[in-house]
């Protein structure tokens, strides 16, 4: 309760502080009365800068400053004479400017466009100002831009926040599958990358507040006047023969965009990554897939192409076409086939009051996944209404073989999973009189008609089968009333979900080891929301009143919840923004709560549940701060979050010999998490250098049960990730990225900690315009036990020759022929040590043609 009061007081103080600020606003026009966008307006007092901003596309601006005395308001804009006025303390804060055109006689000079420009909520990067000769794809270019981070998976973030939209010339061709574009579009086709803050996908929402951010890619004329493409072929040898071939054909016209791609090869795994939807919620995974995901889910914290031997194929066709002025139709289709195999050894040290239980195993997972998918969308997006209907579907066919040696005993495991997902998403918004109406209905059907796991060992065999279906619908009707700075939302939400789940476990001596479940859930929620919005300040309060009903068999259980949320967004100045939110939420029941008979997950692991609905409540408080000076290319973001979780079920693990039983005990418990993150980026333009420092800290406390003993535990994790990307002169490029971490765990009278360090460095030298020589190294030092450390160094060399539209490269990977990688993890009270086999030395030749 004290935490809630503290958060409310903090927000109240913030509002009070805002009230003490005076608004200075006005309009900047030229001598003909036309608005002047992009003018820099600055407020000073006694040579102290109180704040600054830029004028929008209508020439308007607004500043919030503390006026203790006279304030000088000045305006500067390229091509116009500077102007300033003095606002006395007791005068109005309205200040309009009429600028005179400035005529300057210039000597002969080379004029360069600025690397970065800001106009209102749009930040535009000139890509050519950041890229180097070695940057080939759009993804390579995005990694160079200050303030933008691209994760290894391809996910894009701006100032620490995931993007909510990805556009090419203003058109949403790919949705969340933007990996297809960032991996396929050559950087040479891109003029600029725009970051769209306060992003709203619907034009009807243009006057509403949003803290979403999106990316818009602006192409050069070469990419827009004719079909373009990129084609690549590679061949090489390592532990086996290596090959790859890929091609992308692209068309970007004013009304039509098309990207078609075909990739095949066994050098890198790519098929499943290209189909990843970064805008889709991970909670959409069905119960059957969650049960099937534990067989070969272990992956180390390193690039997959260092240890996985893949064989992938992917084909995609994506097209969007404008129909009339406001409407578009879009189709996205693809097929992915991914095969992979790798090997690793694992040692688990499980806590037991009589001494640690140690389990050791070696395994070689081999998996093949085939995934066809299709999406069709119609959208109308005008100032008066927004309509969108999306039909989507995909199928998964997965086969896995996982031989394992457990404590010296060999076993074989094979897995087969077939699944399909289909859905229809409809949404519409329109204005009528003074109300903005909104209707949405999302329906989804998922089926996994056949999942099987077969295990054979010297003790006999076990077969586990699972099948399931899920039908869900999410329906919302809402009205929004607006008056000046006030908005009242009145939404009514009705969601339903029905799960069918059937399991059967057979083997020597096993009888009655099955579950036959049907669980239905309905949620009715009335969620009134009030929003007070100014140009630089938004306060939002929401009080959802919710009723849940759960049916299992002939029994029905009802729940009633009130889940308030308070949100504040305050733009302190043109440079900095603060966001805070406090919320209470509740998550009730999952079909896996009712697994009263064990389900075999893998050779050693069983899963079971108490047979009653889980009930988890969350108190979440978070604060975000970002600071940016685009012209000086400084970007800073910081986040702090606290999460308290009340649960009615306690995780329980029983470890004995070569088996693990995951269960939950009916025991109320509480866990706490504190998460802090910071990111700082500075672009040093004269030497074309990007310097970044990212850091994170995690503290968690909770309770768990193992082998019948209840224990409290606490853990800490601190990670620092510095990076430098420098192109100081035309013939030299230097890159460095590091990861320094310390993890600790404490339970009972036991305290453990381990350190990890990794460094990646590369140098590229271009002695002549068309030739690039490169060398790169990865060095890691991992602590495995209290006194045991393992150091590993990987070394790569490369040669690139460019001539007109051709790029030829020769790469030597893992030149030192390193064959293993080890690391240690702490999971509450248990310790796990892994050792992965690496791919050996490889030589690869690649030819790329861009047209």
PLM feature segments, named:
Residues 206-207, 271-277, 341-358, 399-408, ...:
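Outer-membrane beta-barrel translocator domains and adjoining extracellular loop/strand segments
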Residues 47-60:
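Short, acidic Ser/Thr/Gly-rich low-complexity loop/linker segments typical of extracellular
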Residues 44-48, 70-85:
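A short, solvent-exposed loop/turn motif at the edges and junctions
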Residues 25-36:
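Structural motif
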Residues 320-338, 367-403, 411-553, 561-564, ...:
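Face-selective signature of the C-terminal outer-membrane beta-barrel domain
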